Amino acid sequence: MTEFGMPTLVELPSLEENARLAAALGLKFVESNMNLPMYQAHRLTRERLAPRNGVYFTLHLDEGLNPFDFNPLVREAYLQTAEHTVRLAAESGVPCVNLHMPEGVHFKLPGRKVYLFDEYREEYRASLLAFRERMARAADGRVTVLVENTCFTRLRGLPEALDTLLESPAFALTYDAGHDACDGFAAAEFYRAREGRVKHVHLHQANETTCHLPLGGGRVDENDWLARAENGGMRVVIEVKSREGLERSVNALRERNAIA
């Protein structure tokens, strides 16, 4: 049976309140967004991350985290942040830590954009390898580091970069269906070809310009990824940003018997 979860909501200012809502909705986990000040790694403890009311936690790293920055001092700060978070997850029984794959800086030239990770591939690859090694050590076989699709239409070297990380069993993939809908489904083929490494789905609706919309119909083929999640044992985060949208989405899933 697929395990469904929710993101921490800005409307609910504590893990405890989010866990209570998750339990009331019949969800199994809460994904803690580490952009929020109260969910920074230094404020989280094993006790705070312990399951409650039948609900456990996963972690979503700061969306601005860039462990591939060309500045070594900046890169090291990001690496230490990710390392600390993954170790905390391992010590706390948190099964996975999610990472937005950063696209880095780009320069605008006449008629095109040059992404520096594409232009300076040797430096980029070296930082990918260092990140892979350090996260694998921190995970210690107890945590999966999940890499989420964010920039398939922009960063040409992204598929190769993801495959480099996937050479380590410490890494797997998060497929964000709404992000991909806004990207013209540019990531779908890559993720389907590596479906055995997709362990997590961020499911939400989208239109041409906006994602994180409630479930119940739209550009995203919800049934397709619900079936893939069921067959592949993937977790599914109902990644909408408001309580009202979350409740609507859970009701939409119940109507099709996707969730108990």
Each model region followed by its residue ranges:
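Short, histidine-centered active-site or binding-site loop motifs used for metal coordination
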Residues: L61-L65, E103, Q205-N207
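N-terminal pre-domain/capping segments
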Residues: M1-A90, A172, I259-A260
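Conserved residues at beta->alpha junctions
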Residues: L9, N149, V240
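Histidine-acidic metal/acid-base catalytic patches
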Residues: M1-E3, L12-A24, E83-P95, L99, ...
